[in-house]
Structure formats: C-alpha cells, structure tokens
Amino acid sequence: MTGRGQPPKKNDTYDYPRKQPPKNGSYDNYDYPTSTKTRSTNKQRKDSNYPPRETIFEPDLAADPIYSVPRPPSRVPHKLVKVNYKSNLVPITASNSVSELLSLHDETQVTECVEAPLIAKSPDITVYEKMFSVRPKHTLTKLEGKQKMFTRKKKGSFVKIGSNMLEFGESLKSKLHNDSKKSPDEPDGLVHVPVHLLYPPKHQDPVPAFFIFLEGSIGVGKTTLLKSMNGILGGKNVLAFHEPIAYWTDVFSNSLEEVYKLTLPAKVGRTSNSAKLLACQLKFASPLLALKTATDRLSSPKNSLLSSDMWVMFDRHPLSATVVFPYMHFQNGFLSFSHLIQLWSSFKASRGDNIILLNLNSQENLKRVKKRNRKEEKSVSIEHIRLLNNCYHAVYCAWLLVQNFTPEEIVEVCFNAKHITDLSSSKPSFLAKHVSTEDMLKSSIFNTWIEMTKAHRDSCTLMECLLTFCKELEKVQLIHVNVSPFTDDIPGLWASIYTSIRRNSAIKPNRVNWLALEDLARTFNSQ
C-alpha cells in the first residue's frame, strides 16, 4: 500500500495519479507526472485548458488528490460537472467553526455545463494504443486484398449454389409428393398408379404372335417404321411398344443429354466419367429390361407351330443398351472394360426374340438425324454413326459364331484354351463355306475380350460372365436388312422384312395373352 496521493513503485505501465493543481489555478504551466508511454504527448496536453482525458469529481470527496480515470468513449457520461476553485485556499483545522466551514462551502462554486461535451477533449489514438495495448489495424497487402475479394466472391457463389439446391429440393419434394400439378380429371391431384398391370386379364385362348425388335443406328428409321405399321397391317394385328424417351429424359435426370456430355473428346480415359456413363447406360437398359420381363410373363415359353399374322413390335431390344452402345463407348475410350463387363453381364434375352438389324448409308443416316433436330443429338457426327454401325456389325459377327459353335466352345477360344481353326476343322459349319472363321472372330466383340483378359485367364468369374453372355446371345435371332433402297418406301421396307422372317425357319411365333399385351402397350406408350 502507498500513502494517499503518493505514487506507487515505478512501473512503466501505470499512469501515476496527478498532484493537486497549482495555487494560481492555471493548467498551462503544470507539469504532469506521466509514464514513459504518455510522456511524448505532453506538448499537446499543455495547449488545452482541461486535461485531455475525462476528469470526474465527486462532491462528497475532498479535492485533494485529483484522480484522472481514462475511459473508453462509450462509457463516458453525457453530463459533466465543472468545479471552479478559488485560488486562495484556507486550511481546515479542528478549531474552525461551523460558520467558517459554511463560508468556505459558499466560495466553492459548482456549476453545471450548459452544453457538456461527450469528453473534455478527444485524446490521440496513439495514447489509447499505448495505454491499453491496442494492436494497430493490419493493412492488407495487394495479394491479401485479392485473396479476400476472391473469398467473398466464392462465398457468394456458394450461397447462390445453396439457394439453388434448396429450390431444387423443394421442387423435387413437390414432385415426389405430387403437389405441383393436379390433373384436370383428378381433383385431388393423385397420380394414376397402373396397378391393373399387376393383375392382367386372362385370355381363354392364347394367340400366336411374332415378337419383332427393331434395332440399328440412331435415325435409321425404326420409329418411322413402327408408327407406320398400324396403317400397313390395319391396326388390329399389331401391337407397338415405342422407345421410352420420356423415362430417359424426364425421370430423375436427362440421360440422353448427359451421355452426350460424357462422350466429349476431353473426357477420354477418366475413371469418374466411366462410372457416370455406366449409370446412364443402366438407365437406358432399365425400361427395356422391365418391358422384356413383362412381355415374357404374358407369353408362353413354347413356340407355336402354327402360322400367324399377329405382330408384337418393339423399338429397341436390351441388346443395344447393354451390349452395342457400351461397346462403342469402350472403343472411344470413355468406358472402362470392367464397366463394360458389368453391362454385358446384365444382358437378357428369351427364346423367340427376333431382332431386325436395320442398316443405312452413313451420309443418309446423318441427314435423318439432323432433320429430326433433337437437342441431345446436335453433336452427332458421321464418325459417330460409322463407329456405331461397326459395333453393330461386331455384335452380329459374335452372334454368327454363337449360332455355329456352342457357347462353351466360344469360351474356350476366348480364354486361349482352343484355337478357332481347330473348332472349324472338327465341326464344319455354315460359316466355313462362306467366310473364314478366324476373320469372323477378329471382327467380333470376342476379339476385344481376348485382348483385355489375357492377364486374367484363370478367373472363373470372368469365364462364367462370358458363358452367360453367350448363352443369352444364342437365344435371339438376328436378321440384317439394308434400308438404303427403301428411303421413302415404308411398305416396301416392311415387305422385305416380312419376306426375311418367313424364309427363316428358326423364327416362330409365341403364344401370348393378347388382351393383356394390349393393356400393357396402351399404358407403356402413354407415359
């Protein structure tokens, strides 16, 4: 403890209390005992009539000593009291009477400032920095300023993306809960669920009908032929299942648009790109495989020996989505071989699947693609169409091999357990009379399998995958038809297809539930 009015021990961080003002009442020549941190500002303080910091006097205390309390501006009271002292001070002792004390009180005038300032004088900021150890504000360099500006822009973009995601979530939620639109015939906004397909009507007498799947490059004329079949056959003897464009473009995402973005030249060899392309191809295959399963439930597995003029026609077989187009993406370098095997393993077929492979000149094919003007197909080039036709040809060559040799023999050849020439010599086939089986193997998709699995010939899983694929491919019948002579002659094209079907003894009709198939076709095409 120090005595009243006596400074403590020397400490540079302490602002010593001030002594009593001089008797002349002037602050001009008053020497302020200050610390080393505030000594440099004495010259500025002498120019003022009042101390530069707030001075508070309490009336109940004596005027000696006077303490100066620095406060931040936010805590300074709005009203200050100015005390005027008389210069001739009389010491007070115990012998003073009450009247003398009262006279001394009258001589001390306490007046209220008419317009009290917030503080007596605004102190220099350097004084506060030294007294309270306030760090000066860091001045950003040019590089730091750019980084801060970039962070703000990036934060703003993230906020914008977040708001867009919230809007997308709300729209998706409304779609899932069917709150966005109400159909005019359903006032409650409930979607018509096709539960009637779960309980198909029973047909007393199954009808023999041919299952025809139209396949080929994009824009080759499959949809045009399918739409013309009602006029050619009268409408009562044909059921048409169109391409599920609505499912590919509207359900969850637009896979048609996405697949063309994923097949840009700059995305060759990317693993993440291959995974996305695999997801798109599986989405393409989903409605085709589902429709294939549904029609198989409504048909008899036994082939009918009777002739028939009833036709069930499809725009594409699962062969295109699981085998042909993935093989084209692999040839271009967009799809990895492991993902190609996954798609080939998902290929399914049935006895009685008759695939009509339509082929057209590449130049004419490109003109048809540009003429229909689909926004997803704007980037299609003639090289794309030629490569796609070559992939269909490779699948056709593989089908010819499977038709002339057993699936087990094909697997042995693909795993280098046997040579294709040994098979052709021990078992004369139809191919040996026309083309070389070795050349046919090199032109087929099996040649790619041989090259890509040389290091994994001991894998039983790969062997089973290839065997399953060959057994599924063996079930179908492929007919190659050239469309070029029938550019504007749809009936002539159908006549050529009809003649090829009748000449092929392996193509036979199936017994089907016609009423249930009609209901399925009506529901499938309406979506």
From Swiss-Prot:
Catalytic reactions of this protein: thymidine + ATP = dTMP + ADP + H(+)
Membrane spanning stretches: none
Region (Disordered) location: 1-57
Record SUPFAM superfamilies: P-loop containing nucleoside triphosphate hydrolases
Residues that, per the record, bind substrate: Y260, Q281, R374
Alphabetical keyword list: ATP-binding, DNA synthesis, Early protein, Kinase, Nucleotide-binding, Transferase
Compositionally skewed regions (Basic and acidic residues) per UniProt: 9-18
Residue sites binding ATP per the record: G216, S217, I218, G219, V220, G221, K222, T223, R368
Entry annotation: catalytic residues: E243
Pfam families: Herpes_TK (PF00693), Herpes_TK_C (PF08465)
Regions annotated as coiled coil: none
Assembly mode: Homodimer.
Biological function: Catalyzes the transfer of the gamma-phospho group of ATP to thymidine to generate dTMP in the salvage pathway of pyrimidine synthesis. The dTMP serves as a substrate for DNA polymerase during viral DNA replication. Allows the virus to be reactivated and to grow in non-proliferative cells lacking a high concentration of phosphorylated nucleic acid precursors.
Entry similarity comment: Belongs to the herpesviridae thymidine kinase family.
UniProt cross-references to PANTHER family, sorted A to Z: DEOXYADENOSINE KINASE, DEOXYNUCLEOSIDE KINASE
The name this protein goes by in its record: Thymidine kinase
